[in-house]
């Protein structure tokens, strides 16, 4: 089946699909203070989703393209779940968030199919994959249309990988007690086995969202990157997120000696946001298998255990947490009790001495990850490094922070 036909098959014009903002039925605790964060974007009045411009631009989307799609959503007069929220248009039609971003992705998909130059075609496929992922954002469980967009993103990503520099291999990993999971191993030019970074992504992202990290930071230094989806989304959708948050990544780590392209004696883990929860658990539980662990904006304790901090977090992010935990209709109180169990301090890990070198980067006044969480990580390590990233200029400092983190990882791997 061609990519175009797959799009037509998946996205048949139906209006009975559940609208994203209705999928998690928690008690809404009213108006929220505005939130701005480098890694998560910011709350904008009249939008359910956080608008994550920095990360979308970093992944290769033109700012004007973002505004164009937003404008189409705003201008729609179709029925909405909440008339006050632009991105709650019901059904797969004009104005619906998933429809508009997927339509934009199809434009790039068609460009990719028409392009004769393999490199340029690969770029267009990658662009389409990123747009399909934005269509599926924030990847809530049970969002049928979003899951279809994710399927198209994965297909586009595979097409891109065949044309872009280096080599990408799709790999299947067995996990006892459940379904196998699929990961992508990105390898630079040259002969392996390669030192490798195991990517632990955020809860509101897909594993295919991190190609820029590999291409700009790891590949130029001869470092491979292995990604898997977080539990409950994408290729890991059959696994629920549990307090043993690192379960899937642990099984991948244990399988690396059998992967000929990976130097299993030179492996690091890198965690974004809740992915840092996974990475730090690995630092404690699998220290012989890891040379280093780096974190960025870690969610390891405060957000999971502090009610005041949770009150500052946008509804969408709490919906993401509830969705990953399988608590779609739980009260806020039940969600708070469950989240507390995911704190690595409550679990008795953080605060204990850890032999694995750990770096943690943070932004001051980050509503999701206060400085204290990063200090807790680095002070627990026998070789810890704390990295403050200034907020403005946000894009330049984000890039500089990633370069410093890559330098630190490289010294411990190469």
Curated annotation (Swiss-Prot):
Top-rank taxon: Bacteria
Keyword Hydrolase: yes
Disrupted-gene phenotype: Deletion of the gene increases cell respiration rate on several sugars including glucose.
Catalytic activity: a carboxylic ester + H2O = an alcohol + a carboxylate + H(+)
Gene3D superfamilies: alpha/beta hydrolase (3.40.50.1820)
Keywords assigned by UniProt, alphabetized: Hydrolase, Serine esterase
EC number(s) stated in the UniProt entry for this protein: 3.1.1.1
Gene Ontology biological process terms, A to Z: regulation of carbohydrate catabolic process
Protein name: Esterase FrsA
Organism: Escherichia coli (strain K12)
Taxonomic lineage of the native organism: Bacteria, Pseudomonadati, Pseudomonadota, Gammaproteobacteria, Enterobacterales
């Amino acid at each position: 089946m061609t990519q175009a036909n797959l799009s037509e098959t998946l996205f048949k014009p139906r209006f009975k699909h559940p609208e994203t903002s209705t999928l998690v039925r928690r008690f809404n605790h009213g108006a929220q203070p505005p939130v701005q964060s480098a890694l998560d974007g910011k709350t904008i009045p009249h939008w359910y989703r956080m608008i994550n411009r920095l990360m979308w631009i970093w992944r290769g989307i033109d700012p004007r393209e973002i505004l164009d799609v937003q404008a189409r959503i705003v201008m729609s007069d179709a029925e909405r779940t909440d008339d006050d929220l632009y991105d709650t248009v019901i059904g797969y039609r004009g104005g619906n968030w998933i429809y508009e971003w997927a339509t934009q992705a199809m434009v790039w998909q068609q460009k990719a199919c028409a392009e004769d130059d393999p490199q340029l075609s690969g770029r267009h496929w990658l662009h389409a994959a990123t747009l399909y992922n934005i269509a599926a954002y924030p990847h809530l469980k049970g969002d049928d249309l979003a899951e279809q967009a994710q399927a198209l993103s994965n297909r586009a990503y595979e097409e891109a990988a065949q044309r872009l520099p280096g080599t990408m291999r799709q790999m299947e990993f067995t996990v006892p007690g459940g379904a196998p999971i699929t990961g992508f191993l990105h390898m630079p030019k040259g002969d392996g086995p390669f030192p490798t970074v195991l990517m632990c992504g955020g809860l509101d992202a897909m594993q295919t969202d991190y190609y820029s990290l590999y291409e700009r930071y790891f590949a130029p230094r001869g470092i491979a990157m292995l990604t898997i989806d977080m539990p409950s989304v994408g290729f890991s959708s059959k696994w629920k997120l549990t307090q043993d948050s690192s379960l899937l990544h642990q099984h991948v780590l244990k399988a690396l000696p059998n992967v000929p392209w990976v130097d299993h004696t030179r492996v690091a883990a890198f965690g974004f946001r809740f992915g840092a929860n996974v990475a730090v658990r690995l630092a404690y539980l699998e220290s012989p298998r890891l040379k280093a662990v780096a974190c960025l904006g870690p969610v390891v304790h405060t957000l999971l255990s502090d009610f005041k901090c949770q009150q500052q977090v946008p509804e969408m992010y709490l919906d993401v947490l509830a969705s990953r935990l399988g608590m779609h209709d739980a009260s806020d109180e039940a969600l708070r009790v469950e989240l507390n169990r995911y704190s690595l301090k409550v679990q008795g890990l953080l605060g204990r001495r850890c032999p694995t070198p750990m770096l943690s980067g943070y932004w001051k006044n980050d509503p999701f990850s206060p400085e204290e969480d990063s200090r807790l990580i680095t002070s627990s390590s026998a070789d810890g490094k704390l990295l403050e990233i200034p907020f403005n200029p946000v894009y330049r400092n984000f890039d500089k922070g990633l370069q410093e983190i890559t330098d630190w990882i490289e010294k411990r791997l190469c």
